[in-house]
Structure formats: C-alpha cells, structure tokens
Amino acid sequence: MNYFPWLTIIIVLPIFAGFLILFLPHRGNKVIRWYTLCICIIELLLTTYAFGYHFQLDDPLIQLAEDYKWIDFLDFSWRLGIDGISIGPILLTGFITTLATLAARPVTRESRVFHFLMLAMYSGQIGPFSSQNLLLFFIMWELELIPVYLLLSMWGGKKRLYSATKFILYTAGSSAFLLVGILGICLSASNEPTLNFETSANQSYPVALEMLFYIGFFIAFAVKSPIIPLHTWLPDTHGEAHYSTCMLLAGILLKMGAYGLVRINMELLPHAHSIFSPWLMIVGTIQIIYAASTSPGQRNLKKRIAYSSVSHMGFIIIGLGSINDTGLNGAILQIISHGFIGAALFFLAGTSYDRIRLVYLDEMGGMAITIPKIFTTFSILSMASLALPGMSGFVAELILFFGILTSQKYLLMTKILITFVMAIGMILTPIYSLSMLRQMFYGYKLFTATNSYFVDSGPREFFVSISILLPVIAIGIYPDFVFSLSVDKVEALLSNYFYP
C-alpha cells in the first residue's frame, strides 16, 4: 500500500481550492480566472508526477492504493487506487479541464460561481476513475452531477433550463439503477457484505441474479455513455451549454459511462457480460449507423457534433462486446481519442459562435476567408473525427476492426457482417463531417454580408486548439503510449474472468 495519499490529494485539491474562491478579493474576474487556471495546472502537474514516478507500467494490480476506514459496519471505506484502465481517463480529465478553464475566459457573468463549479466538477470526475469502493464510486458519481446541472442551467442558450432539467432527470433516474445494483452486489456476497471492488470481483452469483445486476448497471452507464435509446438528453444539452462545459461533457463525462461498463459490468460481472456481449455488438452497430445517419439532418452545429459523439461511442460498445485483448484495448484507445477530438470540436464551434453569433449551419458560409486559423484547425480535427490516417481516431477504429475479426466468441459470418456495418458507418462519417465544413466555411454568404469582418483566433484560442491537436497526432503516430498503460491490465482482466 502507498503511504503517501497521492490520490486523496488529487481528488480533494480542486474542490478545496474552489471553496477558497469565495474568499478571494473582489477585484474583478481576472484574479479568479488566473487562480482557477493555476490550480488546474498544479493539479495536472501533480497528477503527472505521481503517476510518472509511482506507477509501474508492467503491474496489472491496483497501484497508489489507499484505504481509510469510514463506516466500519457497512464495510465502507475511503478506498482509492488506479490501474492501467483508469490512469488514461484521469490524465485526460486533468488535461481537458485545464484547457476548458482557459477556454472559459470570456465568461464574465457570475465568474466566481462558474469557476468554483468547474473545480468541483474536476474533483467529481476524477473520483469515479480512482474509487475502489462501490459506494464511494456512487458518491463520486453523484457529486459530479450537481456542478454539471448548475453549469448547464446558469450559462448557455435560451433553452438551457430545459436541457439542464432533461439532463438531471435522465442521470438521476439512471443513478437509482446504479445504487440498487451496488446494494444488490453488497448484500448478495457469498461470505459477508462487501463494497470493495477487489473482493466483489472474486465473488460468484447465480446466473439469473448476475444478469439482473448487469442490466441495472448497464442502464445506469448507458445514459452517461450515451447508448441509444437513452441518448436524447445529449444533443439538447450540447446544443444549449456553454462551449467550455461542452468540452467537459464530451471529453470526460461520456467517458465515465464507458469506464463504468469496463470497471463494473466487465470486471465484476464476467459471466453476464459474456451472455450479453452479442447484444452489445448489435446495439453498437445500430448506434453507429443511426447517429451517423441522423447527424446530417441537424441544423444546429453543436447538435451535429453531439450526434457524431453518439456514433463514435458505438465503436467503444462494439470493442467491449468483442471480449478479446485487441478489441478492449481499441475501445480504451477510442475513449482517449474521442475525449480529445470531441472536446476540440466543441471548443472550435464555440469560438466560431463568439464571432458570428449564429448556431444554424444553413445561415453560415464563407468563414474560411475571414477566420483562416479557425478554419484550418477545425478542418484538421474534423479529419481526425472521420478517422484520417495519422490521427488517433484512425488507429482506434482500425484496432477495433482487428478486435472483432480476431474474436473467438463469434462465427466468421457474424464478424464479417458486423465489420461491414461498421464500414458503412465509417463511410457516413465523412458525409456529415465534410458537409459541416462546407456549410460553415465555404461559399460567400457571410463574406459578402455587411459587417462581415471577424477577428481570427487569438493566442489563447490558438493555444487551446493546438494543445488538443498535438496529442491527437501523437497518438495517431505512436499509439503504443496508450497501450503501454492498459495492455497488461486488459490481459489480466480477460484471462481471469472470461472463459471460451
């Protein structure tokens, strides 16, 4: 066990520093913005140092473990730890949150509250990735919802209250399934009630009961991921939220659902996952085609990007259903890859809106001439979204293809059919991505309009864009950096819990 509480500090620091915002002198928003940005940078550097010097890549076991008794008779403890599956999302959380804080500098209304909520959300998002106790996982899962709801309801478009209410109804309803599943696992343990991940992973349940738990957890995580038909909150939320909030939603929040499917459904309920995996493959293929077909019909720019996120999450679901090392590693790479790409696209959509004050694509056109930097970065990241070779999206989807084709669970014809449908989805992706670029940047609609001069991307915005673009290219060229984190844990997970 690690004797220095690295993970506790990493979780507690942002929200504690957020409370100190209330005591900062009232000297305008500049002090608050710089304070929040410095806290995020310190947190990211602290996380990188702790993982860089104290995390062993070749060890599939839980590392940086902490265990402090809390409520003894319930076996509820402050139990933290990370492994190869959770380290990537935690680093992604720190990176995207830091850039989202920098992106939020134009926010001036209630700046003190806004930045406090950003830091509280930071703690709430790291919590589930590092929890090793089921009840602590649930508490962190719920803690993160409160700042998200307030960020959605207080800053955004005209229908922000509607989208925030829809978000909280969906997520709070799904949390009931999560809590019931956790209590069920705790009380159904064969020896004594337990809430620890490690102990629960070694428990065996009757098949019918395990399937019931699996369905409950799946519903809870399907809302967050999101998985159709529980996805309808996402386009509305993205369409109305401020773009810095959208960066956190697309880059981190959706990945929490996928992480939950791996950490609980796959690791704790292996037999049920093996039974339901063919259905995951079916749902994933339907989701890819459905979202890719629906996206071109969206007039709202951010809603179109939101549906592209739904389509990309379909690839992750298929990777989880493949039940082999290649497929699961590809799914984890897709989680990281889309975290960067989704956050970047929403940031660029928001910076475009700051200039032209238009949300509908059919009202845009001709922006490439007036804002060439935004046009260039938007084009490159759209290419990354449609899996251009050399970008992280291409590597992730290619490995997912290999994962399906090498899976031992499915017949050859089934694998060919799934691969064919996925290929159709990959063909549809350039249709909505390239048409989005055409409607926004090509033509002369805005260029010939009166007052058509727009200021191009400034140093701050260009820095945020490039900071996200560089990891996308780096992972596309050298994906082994991500695989070196997860490959040993994935191998241990599948060898221990799945039987052909």
Swiss-Prot record:
Its main location: plastid. It is found in: Plastid, Chloroplast thylakoid membrane. Belongs to the complex I subunit 4 family. It comes from Morus indica. The keyword Transferase does not apply. One of its GO terms (molecular function) is NADH dehydrogenase (ubiquinone) activity. GO terms for cellular component: chloroplast thylakoid membrane. The chain crosses the membrane at residues 4-24, 37-57, 84-104, 111-129, 134-154, 167-187, 208-228, 242-262, 272-292, 305-325, 330-350, 386-406, 416-436, 462-482. Its EC number is 7.1.1.-. It catalyses: a plastoquinone + NADH + (n+1) H(+)(in) = a plastoquinol + NAD(+) + n H(+)(out); a plastoquinone + NADPH + (n+1) H(+)(in) = a plastoquinol + NADP(+) + n H(+)(out). InterPro entries: NADH_Q_OxRdtase_chain4, NADH_Q_OxRdtase_chainM/4, NADH_UbQ_OxRdtase, ND/Mrp_TM. It is a multi-pass membrane protein. It holds the Pfam family Proton_antipo_M. This is NAD(P)H-quinone oxidoreductase chain 4, chloroplastic. One of its GO terms (biological process) is ATP synthesis coupled electron transport. Keywords: Chloroplast, Membrane, NAD, NADP, Plastid, Plastoquinone, Quinone, Thylakoid, Translocase, Transmembrane, Transmembrane helix. The keyword Chaperone does not apply.
